[in-house]
């Protein structure tokens, strides 16, 4: 009875991986590309295995331990918080940690665990560790949506006499195989297109994404870069499609709350591991970055905090001030080209469940495929129309490119309230509401939180993206992300820590605004309750007033 449940996901994964690998191998032009393909596969497997190992066991232990019931929520909150910090900022902090004179490399050399003359930051181990810290939140978030569906089944199996190994093989692994496979496929697909972290660390590993970047920006070999990009897409699209299919299947799976075990030792200890990786290590790296900041001294930070004078000096830095307006314009363009089409599409396809499902799968695939290969393909499309792209401002082209993942994310956010919105619109139509009333009083209030969240998501994409502005077919627009990436890569001496902190604070401010917009109905109800009911409530009763 258990064999089909195990065989179906494994067969899909095997077909996707083998088919993608064969297609990519045949599309690659030469031996250098084949070697980069092998390096990419090796790096993806290592990062995926470590993310699953460090994410699945601690999260399962946190859900099963009875002492701290809020611990799983803490893990999810820390994972979401770590995703708010741009990848460039996190990579810069990791670069400070892994640098030749950094604390980690110095300590390893003192303990004779690392060769004296060999740098740590450009090593393969540093890249793997850095990518694990970047993609571990994805694993925790995906698994946290599916692990509660186990319910009391592990306890029931133990009560019936099943051992730990037998319970794992017959109960736990079959039920969690699909979410584990989903998390692994998502992480693997993201590693395929990673550029920022290896470049900032100065890695010697030449992956397919790095090879494409070199061909486009150094040797200007556009045809070969396009061919490798097609190979990367052939490798990633089957993986992304299977991951999207598994996520869609998990949406319809029956979920039961995972109750704490009666006796489960070591859960809190295991749960500390991802907390240290996602919370303590970034905090220490932030302090380390501040210590190397030429603008902000540690003494003034602890005495008076990040004062307005510090913000003024950071904002007056010429390079940072020069990219503020282009970054804002790219963000606005990306928000406009992603939110409004997603809003229109999500409303138009509400009565068609199969069309909604197809759009969900397409949006997930667009999010999971490597963004660098997608940027190269958009680069080639724009190159076919030189007159049109010459008349469009560079910031608008960059925003249009970033709108591709932005549209996918915005549509998924709005589709989450699609069923409720469809029922509300049907009820309003039954009660005789006009089309404008249904739009203004039903559709927009239901979609407003999703629109606000999508607005914040486009800000995250803009502040963390270098691909869609770096691969423009003419002189690219310089944004905050490209400025930080260029300075970190080419060894300039700006105040990178100050700029990263400002970016992080700006993102947190946007998230706070989105959270307030989402919770506005509840806040309004609390205000009404605190002020008092109107007089009609006293005359007609609470239910009549409602």
Model-found features: residue ranges?
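Glycine-rich helix-loop "coupling/hinge" segments at transmembrane-helix boundaries
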Residues: 194-222, 298-304, 465-493, 528-531
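Membrane-interface capping segments at transmembrane-helix boundaries
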Residues: 150, 245-253, 420-423, 515-527
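Flexible interhelical linker loops that connect adjacent transmembrane helices
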Residues: 243-270
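Short, highly charged, low-complexity non-transmembrane loops/tails of multi-pass membrane proteins
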Residues: 157-160, 428-431, 524-540
